[in-house]
Amino acid sequence: MIVKICGLKKSVDVKAAVENGADMIGFVFAKSKRQVTIEQAHQLAKNIPPNIKKVGVFVNPTEDELTAAIKGVPLDIVQLHGQEPTEQADRTDAEVIKAFPVKEGKLPNNINDYSNAYILLDAPAEEYEGGSGKTFDWDKVNSDLLIKNKLIIAGGLNVENVKEAINRFEPYAVDISSGVETNGEKDPEKIKIFIKTAKGVGK
């Protein structure tokens, strides 16, 4: 199972993710309590080996903003959480994760328009896009409509429910942020336990 740890701001947290086998590490550039600058992400990325993909999280960025971050960090993947058009995703010089909020179990009508992107299902936004710590209604989602090897599950995951999420959706990856935090800060021990748990499913 591919595991993405998102919203990292400190070198100690990056170290915990790297040492415990994270496959993707996410930096949030959109407005958020976890927001970092390109320069901060660049410094943190120096401690990430090339086999771990660096992901930048954005909400309705301009193409110049995307390009600056892709080159400046540098990023392997951009994660788009707004109303970005398919054309922007197709033109981006990086892999793309397109995030969709799942409201009342309904998948957005345009979810399959992003044919070249990974599809991330998340809980509906609150003050900021993503990272709310809440799950969407798993029971109402027909994941058979989605391509499994492009599917990423996020939204309220933690060590207690990640096994059920993986068994239910059979996703390509799982994505966590607040579920590995204590009092709003990343917790290296929780990062370790979550990665071990997620990667242990089915073994």
Swiss-Prot record:
Pathway(s) per entry: Amino-acid biosynthesis; L-tryptophan biosynthesis; L-tryptophan from chorismate: step 3/5
Q: Which reaction does it catalyse?
A: N-(5-phospho-beta-D-ribosyl)anthranilate = 1-(2-carboxyphenylamino)-1-deoxy-D-ribulose 5-phosphate
Q: What keywords were assigned to this record?
A: Amino-acid biosynthesis, Aromatic amino acid biosynthesis, Isomerase, Tryptophan biosynthesis
Question: Which terms in the Gene Ontology molecular function aspect does this entry carry?
Answer: phosphoribosylanthranilate isomerase activity
Query: Which Gene Ontology BP terms does the record give?
Result: L-tryptophan biosynthetic process
SUPFAM superfamilies cross-referenced by the UniProt entry: Ribulose-phoshate binding barrel
Question: Which Gene3D superfamilies does the record cross-reference, listed alphabetically?
Answer: Aldolase class I
* EC numbers for this chain: 5.3.1.24
**Into which EC class is this enzyme placed?**
isomerase
Pfam families recorded for this chain? PRAI (PF00697)
Superkingdom assignment: Bacteria
Record HAMAP family: PRAI
Similarity comment: family membership: Belongs to the TrpF family.
Record's protein name: N-(5'-phosphoribosyl)anthranilate isomerase
Q: What organism is the protein native to?
A: Listeria innocua serovar 6a (strain ATCC BAA-680 / CLIP 11262)
Encoding gene, per UniProt annotation:
trpF
